């Protein structure tokens, strides 16, 4: 176990270089996501792909050329620390994070 935050209802597990967040739908974080899995809700907040090298402007431009709207680039925490990332939606409405290397 990487980290446990009972106040948030969060357990983080490490698998190699990846970090997996387990959040019960009844906890503080989970209930903020809406209904439990089914027709009205999903069981996934987002998944992440590591992108290196990470050029936010080039990524946003490439996505726009394919009709994909990207969220604003921002520094976010991840499995290896804080680094740049961009959120997009896949064709089924799942949130995908494109994550760059950590910032020193």
Kindly give the residue locations of the regions a language model identified:
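Core segments of cupin and vicinal oxygen chelate
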Residues: 1-21, 25-29
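Residues that flank catalytic or metal-binding motifs in active/ligand-binding sites
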Residues: 9, 16-18, 40-45, 84
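A short acidic/small-residue loop/turn micro-motif
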Residues: 27-28, 102-104
């Amino acid at each position: 176990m990487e980290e446990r935050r009972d106040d948030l209802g969060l357990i983080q597990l490490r698998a190699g270089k990846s970090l997996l967040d387990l959040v019960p739908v009844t906890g503080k974080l989970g209930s903020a996501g809406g209904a439990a899995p089914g027709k009205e809700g999903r069981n996934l907040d987002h998944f992440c792909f590591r992108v290196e090298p990470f050029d936010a402007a080039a990524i946003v431009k490439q996505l726009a050329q394919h009709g994909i709207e990207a969220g604003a680039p921002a520094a976010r925490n991840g499995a290896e620390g804080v680094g740049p990332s961009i959120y997009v939606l896949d064709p089924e409405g799942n949130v995908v994070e494109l994550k760059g290397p950590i910032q020193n």
